[in-house]
Amino acid sequence: MEFTASPKPQLSSRANAFSIAALMSSGGPKEKEAAENTIKPLEQFVEKSSCAQPLGELTSLDAHAEFGGGGGSPSSSSLCTEPLIPTTPIIPSEEMAKIACSLETKELWDKFHELGTEMIITKSGRRMFPTIRVSFSGVDPESKYIVLMDIVPVDNKRYRYAYHRSSWLVAGKADPPLPARLYVHPDSPFTGEQLLKQMVSFEKVKLTNNELDQHGHIILNSMHKYQPRVHIIKKKDHTASLLNLKSEEFRTFIFPETVFTAVTAYQNQLITKLKIDSNPFAKGFRDSSRLTDIERESVESLIQKHSYARSPIRTYGEEDVLGEESQTTQSRGSAFTTSDNLSLSSWVSSSSSFPGFQHPQPLTALGTSTASIATPIPHPIQGSLPPYSRLGMPLTPSAIASSMQGSGPTFPSFHMPRYHHYFQQGPYAAIQGLRHSSAVMTPFV
């Protein structure tokens, strides 16, 4: 049985305009055009730091379009090697064209730029490091200027960090742009004389990923690349506030070495190390693991002395003498001593006749000779000390036999908490409760 395809019904021109095929064919160019109008790549503005761009030409400031001096598109002369003014509909005056801006911390920024600068963003806001610090020249000493800063996306891409390659890779299209904000330097307006004598530091700028931020922080998307920009505006005498700058003249300065990737946690470990080493406020991260061997040894010895001096059970160090006639010393961090001139059988037979131990005198500080510690029952064997475990418990004969073999005990040393739950009844009562029934009973010395 043969089937014949029925002819498709003919649609009118008006109905054909609303068909699925027509909507799909017309939707592509519109979406692409909308995306281009929403996020314009700023790669041409990043290549040269000495080029100036009018503030109102970039879509990152659409929300503050009144700050601009014109809405024309940037011309091909925006890529330049000298501080020239591009041929835009509104050309700044000769006074603004003479103004030059230099990045004070360029050497530090270059170090980060080689590795790929990353900036942390948080809900509450995080300050930038390195900080944007600039100085101006060519300004009129008698005029007043307003210095601003903003951060715009470099491109319309989202990035991810490839750990196996130690590099950033494109992960897809950028997230929807966040509200653009201008950061006005709190000391503005400056006089030209002030700008010639001092640098302008944006150390109080904070970056956040909180879209509902009400503190004036700059809102950024994580895993996106951004370019900070510095703007200088000449303030007219008739300007009452910073909100009315529609007719002001300005210049914009971009430094390509300040490009960074916004992250919620550092991806490159080299960036983390460089920030800790370069940031004077990161001293808290320079722990003992970053010290030299000599410094680390002194720190560890101080920690060890502190824990020993405050330990509820006295542990003997290498400075401790185990008896008036004994010359045996201990290595630091061990509470064990063995007798080299006494056999195991004679030691067990001698120790089995010891009565129950009594409470000794209070513990003394580290380094005090054991001769000053009163012993209620003197030990019959001079020059030796029964082995004790880390908790101060006498070891079993099997443990003693294993410790007597070789050059000496090699028991590991672990730091115990100062107030363990076993010591709530007193250290010696707790030891009695922990002692095995077959353990040898010996007094403390």
From Swiss-Prot:
A Gene Ontology cellular-component term: nucleus
Entry keywords, A to Z: Developmental protein, DNA-binding, Nucleus, Transcription, Transcription regulation
Chain residue ranges for the region called Disordered: 318-337
GO biological process, one term: endocardial cushion formation
Main location: nucleus
InterPro entries in the cross-refs: p53-like_TF_DNA-bd_sf, T-box_DNA-bd, T-box_sf, TF_T-box, TF_T-box_CS
Record's compositionally biased regions (Polar residues): 325-337
GO molecular function terms noted in the UniProt entry: DNA binding; DNA-binding transcription activator activity, RNA polymerase II-specific; DNA-binding transcription factor activity; DNA-binding transcription factor activity, RNA polymerase II-specific; RNA polymerase II cis-regulatory region sequence-specific DNA binding; RNA polymerase II transcription regulatory region sequence-specific DNA binding; RNA polymerase II-specific DNA-binding transcription factor binding
DNA-binding region(s) from the entry: 108-287
Expressed in which tissues: Prominently expressed in the extraembryonic mesoderm, developing heart, eye analage and motor neurons of hindbrain and spinal cord. Expressed in extraembryonic tissues such as the amnion and allantois.
Location of this chain's protein in the cell: Nucleus
Disruption phenotype: Embryos die at mid-gestation. The heart tube of deficient mice does not elongate, but anterior and secondary heart field markers are not affected.
Functional summary from the UniProt entry: Acts as a transcriptional activator and repressor required for cardiac development and may have key roles in the maintenance of functional and structural phenotypes in adult heart.
Protein name: T-box transcription factor TBX20
Species name: Mus musculus (Mouse)
Lineage: Eukaryota, Metazoa, Chordata, Craniata, Vertebrata
Gene name, Swiss-Prot/TrEMBL: Tbx20
